[in-house]
Amino acid sequence: MASVQQNGQRFGVSEPISMGGPTEFDVIKTRELEKHLQDVGLYESKEEAVRREEVLGILDQIVKTWIKTISRAKGLNDQLLHEANAKIFTFGSYRLGVHGPGADIDTLCVGPRHATREGDFFGELQRMLSEMPEVTELHPVPDAHVPLMGFKLNGVSIDLLYAQLPLWVIPEDLDLSQDSILQNADEQTVRSLNGCRVTDQILRLVPNIQNFRTTLRCMRFWAKRRGVYSNVSGFLGGINWALLVARICQLYPNALPNILVSRFFRVFYQWNWPNAIFLCSPDEGSLGLQVWDPRINPKDRLHIMPIITPAYPCMNSSYNVSESTLRIMKGEFQRGNEICEAMESNKADWDTLFEPFAFFEAYKNYLQIDISAANVDDLRKWKGWVESRLRQLTLKIERHFKMLHCHPHPHDFQDTSRPLHCSYFMGLQRKQGVPAAEGEQFDIRRTVEEFKHTVNAYTLWIPGMEISVGHIKRRSLPNFVFPGGVRPSHTSKGTWDSNRRSEHRNSSTSSAPAATTTTTEMSSESKAGSNSPVDGKKRKWGDSETLTDQPRNSKHIAVSVPVENCEGGSPNPSVGSICSSPMKDYCTNGKSEPISKDPPENVVAFSKDPPESLPIEKIATPQAHETEELEESFDFGNQVIEQISHKVAVLSATATIPPFEATSNGSPFPYEAVEELEVLPTRQPDAAHRPSVQQRKPIIKLSFTSLGKTNGK
């Protein structure tokens, strides 16, 4: 393998952290990793690969026939008619070479100036596809942020975008990497081209494409198993993971995938967000397109985990990340780092790293969002809309009630006994470090109702599209959320996560007074009385509040939350920044502040490796701009940006990687939940009338009555 030193090329915005090559141990562990990825079915067969290539060839011929047809219909002269052309490009996981069996192929059709998006792409081409027997499940989405058509061609799923270039003829050797291709292009075309341009640029900026692909396959699989693979839910999507892996490949250009995976967790566990990730210095360009730059654009300062695309115009690919989802991902990076260190001493293996996250064991309280529609097509549209708005519910709850953390599950669940229904779940946990007065309650009825009102204001809403939001305890979760529809008889044992939880509980018991959590939970459950759920079903608040009769009516929930250990300051107070950014002065005033609180005494150090030299330039991080962005629409006015600002502890860059530490509350498992929620009976609204937003207030309260008892007061 040619090293970066040998060919004299430097990748990225900084010098590498390590130029070290692989050891025999690395070769063995990488082979084990590759075998594991093959065993779990991440690689497609040769037959499927050939079929995909054939389908792409068919699609290319379809768009070429389409462009000839519309050119003739528009009366172009013989020369232009002869030269009329459209071309298919691929991007995303297929172009990166990390797609798996049955995965969609992201494709882009590039057409000339006279082939319009509205009239021709979503007109004639859509008609042609709808009449072809080999095309099934055709779903045009012309109003999306990036308009596309989804369909299956000979059984292969295709997402087709369109870019209309200001050219009369599209050459076969068209190079999309040239910035001039964006000149005079509309915004939708720029966004459509961006996928191909970013994908190709990533492949140009990594030192070894094969090592990059293996590592990215691993990280995508890991993220899906751990429930942090979903851009729409506020986690990271495919392009985000590709950019992060590419950056690690730049920092360790001669490393094999086993080391790249380990260093991925090591680097990003310590990364001082919101310092941005860059693969190359951002190009401001000469076309006047807006680029990500928090020095100029105030909205860019709101991003808390910026991962910047390498192609002009550079954008933040991770703008959906929230405070809670960032906290969850940092916890997962910490877990991954611990396991990779344990693997070096043969105390863990790849199976341990890829253990699925037990979402329905991690919390004691959940929100359940149920939706339904009249038919399959309506449900598909309704699901897409609701999924795009669920992040707003998370942000609203966290903004309005700063003592709660929300953990959204990235996927929906289907109850086979209820066709045309699906459910989403969010774990609820009291936020650590928030002081609370005894008996204090917080009514979030309006928060939930605003969310439902926004969802129900869907411009394509039709009767039959329904939504309801309710609280459910862990013991009452429906069976359809569990694998095979069978509720486990006991919680997971023997896994890395369960062992770490046990260790944490044992250490907490030995160092703290007698716990009163169990007593509190039992007493709180007894208060529920007849409202307690039976037979695993979700609580009901009356016939008028059922999904069918009154889907927009409110649910009434009270939350009783015992005290948890509080976190102080940064999650890793002694961990220095290893960030590197070409934008040194994008913060408000260029100043940095020391950690305001001392690290807790029970912090555990995990690192065994000697520190690595980091020849990375120092930068100043933003002083206080870690905020969250809420989007409002419809009856709540135009898009509104609401900020939640809190002091960000800033650490300056250092020249070494210090030892790793646990979270500031001493817990290696950041999702430990100790609170209980209870339902309060309330007067039901009149089912004959649809109440207004002000009238429809689900009583969802947080009660801190038991806090004094938990503290031993």
Swiss-Prot record:
Q: In which tissues is it expressed?
A: Expressed in stems, cotyledons, hypocotyls, radicle, leaves, and, to a lower extent, in roots (including primary and secondary roots as well as root tips) and flowers. In radicle, roots and leaves, mainly present in vascular tissues.
Q: Does the keyword Membrane apply?
A: no
Q: Where does ATP bind?
A: F91, G92, S93, A103, D104, I105, D106, D159, Y229, G238, I239
Return one Gene Ontology term, BP aspect: negative regulation of innate immune response
Q: This protein's superkingdom?
A: Eukaryota
Q: Where in the cell is it found?
A: Nucleus
**CC per GO annotation:** nucleus
Q: Which SUPFAM superfamilies match?
A: Nucleotidyltransferase, PAP/Archaeal CCA-adding enzyme, C-terminal domain, PAP/OAS1 substrate-binding domain
Alphabetic keyword roster: ATP-binding, Magnesium, Metal-binding, mRNA processing, Nucleotide-binding, Nucleotidyltransferase, Nucleus, Transferase
List residues binding Mg(2+) 1: D104, D106
Obligatory cofactor(s): Mg(2+); Mn(2+)
Q: Where is this site: Interaction with RNA?
A: N320, R391, K396
**Which GO-annotated molecular functions does the record name?**
ATP binding; metal ion binding; poly(A) RNA polymerase activity; RNA binding
Which InterPro entries does this one have? NT_sf (IPR043519), NuclTrfase_I-like_C (IPR011068), PolA_pol_cen_dom (IPR007012), PolA_pol_NTPase (IPR048840), PolA_pol_RNA-bd_dom (IPR007010), PolyA_polymerase (IPR014492)
Deletion phenotype, per the entry, is: Lethal.
Q: Where is the composition biased (Low complexity)?
A: 507-526
- Decide whether keyword Ribosomal protein is in the record: no
Q: How is the cofactor bound?
A: Binds 2 magnesium ions. Also active with manganese.
Q: Give the top-level enzyme category.
A: transferase
Q: Which reaction does it catalyse?
A: RNA(n) + ATP = RNA(n)-3'-adenine ribonucleotide + diphosphate
Residues bound to Mg(2+) 2: D104, D106, D159
Oligomeric and partner information:
Monomer. Forms a complex with cleavage and polyadenylation specificity factor (CPSF) subunit PAPS4.
Q: What is this protein called?
A: Nuclear poly(A) polymerase 1
Q: State the organism of origin.
A: Arabidopsis thaliana (Mouse-ear cress)
Gene field: PAPS1
